[in-house]
Amino acid sequence: IFGGSLGAKKINEAVFKSIDKLKDFNIIHIVGKNNSKSIEKPNYFQIEFAKNIWDYFNLADLVVSRAGANSIFEIQALKKPMLLIPLGKTQSRGDQIENAEAFKRYGFASVLYEEELTPVTLFKSITNLNKNKERYIKRMEEVSSVPSNKLVLQKILDLSK
């Protein structure tokens, strides 16, 4: 679970409050600099920053992330089912919402909008993603790099308008 290089307060708080419910998952939580909280659970590992995020992505069965283009394409390349929590329009240009919705349309990810993020919705979303992870993996395996390139090209064209 990570909210970008600086972390994400709302994601972190939802994770902290849902740790007990997420007991069936082993969680690596990248909280961002100065966002650590003392939580001692056998299934929970917390770090402030990951120098090589790919190592953590490779370890993961599922990824919970913001919806920045670089990150989600890296996660897709590794064929990891993902729950995307895009920055809202009040915090960004809205590009993360567009990215998340495109990945949802293509069957690569599920989406939980930040405005709907609570410990309960986070738990339900992670549980549903886990139940359906094979479907997401299969969909990512079906898609060659050509459609991914088309997604990137379409994004560039959309941004240039």
What are these regions (language model features)?
Residues 1-65, 97-101, 112-120:
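Donor-nucleotide binding loops and adjacent catalytic segments primarily
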Residues 5-7, 87-91, 142:
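Short histidine/acidic/glycine/proline-rich micro-motifs that form metal-
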Residues 53-93:
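A donor-sugar binding/catalytic signature common to diverse glycosyltransferases
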Residues 74, 86-113:
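Glycine-rich phosphate/nucleotide-binding loop
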Residues 108-133:
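C-terminal "capping" alpha-helix adjacent to the active site of nucleotide-linked donor transferases
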Residues 128, 145-161:
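C-terminal alpha-helical cap of glycosyltransferases
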